[in-house]
Amino acid sequence: MFDLLTIPRSMRLASPGRSRLRRWTFRLTSLFAIAGLVVVGYRWWTQPRPTPPTEIFRGVIYTCIELSEPECRGLLHLVKIDLNAPGIQLYMTRTDPEAVAHGYQYRLETAPAVLEREHLALVVNAAYFTSDSGVLQWSGDWARGVQTIVADGQVSHIDPHSYLLWFESDLTPHLEFEKPPKAAVLRQARWGIGGGAVPLWKGKLREAAAGHEMDRRTAVAIDTGRRLLWVAVFENASSTAVAQVLAEQGAKDGFLLDGGHSTTMVLSPQAAHVQSGSLIHEWRPVATFLGIRAESLQ
């Protein structure tokens, strides 16, 4: 009778339990590999690509530009809104009554949720904020805004350090180059959003208000005379480069909003001729949003 120890390892029979374990291990490994390939393929297929100026809603033109300058790299998603176009409406986050009752102003939300609920053509993150969140931020967490927000005539608070980009009831845009904004301006403003510095003024870069640190950026700019609004998100840019790029696009006055991990732009599924959905978005909920409603081309 053979001693099991004398039988070569290659001739020994594997136990049924061990064989099943190996088969299941192989199947699971294959399944995860296939799932990984699907995810990578989907992300490649759906990732934004450079796009020439394209009207996606009535009066709303989207452009995607790939930049490779020293202080501006990656994709720029730029939306120009003609405030003269029929059907254009603005959206700004209003203070939440329940949050106010608890000593806060807002509840954190994600951009896709706001886009769907408010029936927006596009949405971007707005002002800086603080929240009662711990290590992770979740939708529904209490939050306070840093800069002033005017939402349908409702003023969130007066931040003494905020410049104000604001709109009259007919959507004529202005940038108040005095902080805090005067009471008369706040009475006129139907919509408004505060910013901490103005790197673009009268079509030129203000170097004293701009820096060279690179990060994800969200910015807004206007041309009062032509009644135009630009909303832009940059994958990686300095505030100096942001101001220069917006000036090259024809904007006259503008500033940065919250950026970094807050940077978000989402387009509605009704956007014509371009890929919709999240162009830059990390699913981080934020406190306030700037949105646009517009008539569909479809």
Predicted regions and their residues:
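Conserved beta-alpha junction segments in alpha/beta enzyme cores
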Residues: 67, 76-78, 192-223
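N-terminal intrinsically disordered, acidic low-complexity segments at the extreme N-terminus
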Residues: 1-9
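Active-site-adjacent helix-turn-beta-strand microarchitecture at beta-sheet edges
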Residues: 129-204
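Zymogen propeptides
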Residues: 12-15, 22-156
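Short, solvent-exposed aromatic-acidic interface loops
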Residues: 94-99, 179-184, 233-238
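Conserved, well-ordered active-site substructure
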Residues: 136-157, 206-257, 262-298
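Short acidic-glycine loop/turn motifs at beta-strand connectors
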Residues: 82-85, 131-132, 166-172, 202, ...
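General beta-strand structural signal in soluble alpha/beta enzymes
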Residues: 122-126, 175, 254-258
